[in-house]
Amino acid sequence: MPYLYRVAYDGALFHGFTGHSNSVEAALRRVFGHLLGRGSRTDPGVSAVGNAVLAPSRLPLGYINSRLPRGVWTWAVAEVGEGFNPRRARRRRYLYVAPHWGEDVEAMREVAELFKGTHDFSSFIQFRGERGTPPVTTVDEVGVEVAGRLVYLYFVGKGFRNKQIRKMAWAILAAGRGVVSRRYVEELLERPRPGAVPSAPAEGLILLDIEYDVKFDVDRGELRKAYVYFLEKYRRLEALAAAYRAAGERLLFYDDL
């Protein structure tokens, strides 16, 4: 009987989810022997708290995690039927986080609204040689929130194509900075031009959740280990950011002498 496992990981420590010896999938394969499928293939640098993998056997989550490298955890498991495909999810939820440097919030929200619904997203996809597949996808929700010095972009849909979220994030942020107009983005959706839009940095993207019609058994102890890791890393990076800011301000002080 196959089992579906929830997986969280720090994307900064791995060369993507798959396709490399230092990938998250490679680390999981070394524990399970082999895997039967995955929920989402994330790029190098992209983190996740709710990705999923399908494995042929049930192992204790603590046992799995004790054999995984630092920065990746399984924290829940569900028994599923034969033939279950983890790619066929109800919804996927992503969050993109970026610094807020005064971007126009309303301009960002106007562009975010354009992405809702069903469109040909060729301008916002990096093709992997699958041009025979229609690049039409449906985006259910796109949200823009600003809190303090950060911009939070939320994306919800059944599925997204390669680099699609990072390219949409770039367009939203660029609109807030006045780099592109709402009309420019509309034209890219109406008359697609592959390669017209760059990707926002991978490090700002997090796969929050993949929704399935299954009930997971959550190991709160293993879940907390992942939580503590991310909290401690946040605190370290916050202190590092403050140190860099202080260094920059000191350099300006010398410039005024």
UniProtKB/Swiss-Prot annotation:
Reaction it catalyzes: uridine(38/39/40) in tRNA = pseudouridine(38/39/40) in tRNA
EC number from the UniProt entry: 5.4.99.12
Biological process terms in GO annotation: tRNA pseudouridine synthesis
Superkingdom, natural source: Archaea
Keywords associated with the record: Isomerase, tRNA processing
Matches recorded under InterPro entries: PsdUridine_synth_cat_dom_sf, PsdUridine_synth_TruA, PsdUridine_synth_TruA_a/b_dom, PsdUridine_synth_TruA_C, TruA/RsuA/RluB/E/F_N
Active site: D43 (nucleophile)
Family to which this protein belongs: Belongs to the tRNA pseudouridine synthase TruA family.
Role played: Formation of pseudouridine at positions 38, 39 and 40 in the anticodon stem and loop of transfer RNAs.
Database matches in HAMAP family: TruA
Protein name as annotated: tRNA pseudouridine synthase A
Biological source species: Pyrobaculum calidifontis (strain DSM 21063 / JCM 11548 / VA1)
